[in-house]
Amino acid sequence: MWCVAELNQQYIRKMEDVLAVYEKPYDAAQPVVCLDEKPIALHADVRSPIPAKPGKPAKQDNEYERCGTANVFGVVEPKTGRHFTTATPDRSGAEFARMVGYVVKQYPFAKTIHLVMDNLNSHTRNSLINCYGEQEGGYLWDRLTVHYTPKHGSWLNQAEIELSMYSRQCLGKRRFPDVNLLRRETQAWRG
């Protein structure tokens, strides 16, 4: 389903905030980093696929076995081209907190990290505090200047582009029966 956002004052304010962050010249002391996540359905083949042969395409049965879900984080620093993509076993506040911890460690000399992300229920200071404790979780959150995209404004998050490329180039129409294979393939795609 495609949603058309209501262009109210809140939407416009958040949109203009994100666009203003993108418009700033590059500053290593205040990098702009975009974060997004994508749920992945894990499926196993019921019958082994038949590989391609000269003159014959590969064949894969449309029947599959459900094996749960996983999550993929995409992080992009648009001004430098740096990007990180990683698979996690689930979409939780703890996984989000670990990803933010990883991002903060990548920028040890930054005064603040401008983090553009959507307003998902786990994208909060509490997720970091629950994972790392009050002191470290609070410290990590305080290293960020958070810029939430407006509701139905995910197109403003440049990490969406990263995850779109990942979906086409890495996932394609392949099936991943477990998060370990998904992690290995994600790491190989990331290079």
Where are these regions (language model features)?
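Short, conserved catalytic or adaptor-binding loops enriched in Gly and charged residues
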Residues: Q135-R143
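Electropositive, glycine- and tryptophan-enriched low-complexity nucleic-acid-binding patches
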Residues: K53-K111
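Mobile genetic element proteins and their domesticated derivatives, centered on retroelements
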Residues: C34-D36, V75, G81, V100, ...
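Short catalytic/ligand-binding loop motif for oxyanion handling, primarily in non-cytosolic enzymes
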Residues: A41-H43, S122-R125, W155-Q158
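Conserved, non-catalytic sequence blocks in retroelement Pol enzymes and Pol-derived host proteins
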Residues: Y64, D178-L181
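Charge-mixed, compositionally biased segments that are often intrinsically disordered regulatory tracts
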Residues: M1-R66
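Acidic/histidine-rich, metal-coordinating catalytic segments
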Residues: K111-T124
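Active-site proximal helix-loop segment of RNase H-like, two-metal nucleases, encompassing DDE(D)
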Residues: K151, A159-D178
